Amino acid sequence: MRRVILPLVMTVTLCLAQEASEACTKALTDCENDLECQNRLAPLMAACSTNTCQPQCRSAVLNVYQNKLGRILLRSDATCIPGRDELRTCNFLPAESTVHCSLGKLACEGDLQCNSKFGVFMSECEADAARGACTDKCKTLLNQTIETSVGSVFSNCTCTARDDQLCTNLKDNLLGVCLKNTPGVTLSPSDNSITDAPGGNDLADSSVGHGFNILSAISVYLLTVLVF
């Protein structure tokens, strides 16, 4: 049995390794060689493997992003990160076109230009937006935030079905009120969990396809062992 299992593990590992880009592999190695980044990365590896966009995965991603080497890894193409399909589907990757609102806020707070614009918007407009009101001044302030390179994620950021109120409050009560009826802005749905995704979700399909490729490799190997 051991003679069968060892090559099987090597086959699966090879299938995964062949898809990893050099940039992602370097970023992952750098993170694993740094104790702080490694300690932040371990919970992500464990939590982001259920394909259900759990809060534990979100918290782990936000924790990794607060580390410099972790940010570099998450900003890569993520081809070397286990659970990458879940990270994409849950919008937990900062380089994607649609980003989780809490991750977008964290990225904005780390950028001087975005943070200064967003800080003014929050101080001037948070109270009114919480009541469902948004003045023209507040719309202008939010647009100024969105016009920054990092703040652009606020125009279509999203939450998952299992999110806490911090994300939904930011998306629906603060951003949503002022983005409503804004030309060129399309609000993303809050629910983007894998388990509840519609059948036409390309990201969910890619996740299934990736798993199918691995299972195919395993099936071919086992068939070879049984025949020969």
From Swiss-Prot:
Residues 206-228 form a propeptide. Its main location: membrane. Pharynx muscle cells from its early formation, in the two-fold embryo, until the adult stage. Keywords: Cell membrane, Developmental protein, Glycoprotein, GPI-anchor, Lipoprotein, Membrane, Signal. Glycans are attached at N143, N156. InterPro entries: GDNF/GAS1 (IPR016017). GO terms for cellular component: plasma membrane; side of membrane. The keyword Glycoprotein applies. A lipid is attached at D205 (GPI-anchor amidated aspartate). It is a lipid-anchor; GPI-anchor. Transmembrane segments: none annotated. It is found in: Cell membrane. Residues 1-17 form the signal peptide. One of its GO terms (biological process) is negative regulation of cell cycle G1/S phase transition. Role in pharynx function or development. This is Growth arrest-specific protein 1 homolog. It comes from Caenorhabditis elegans. The gene is phg-1.
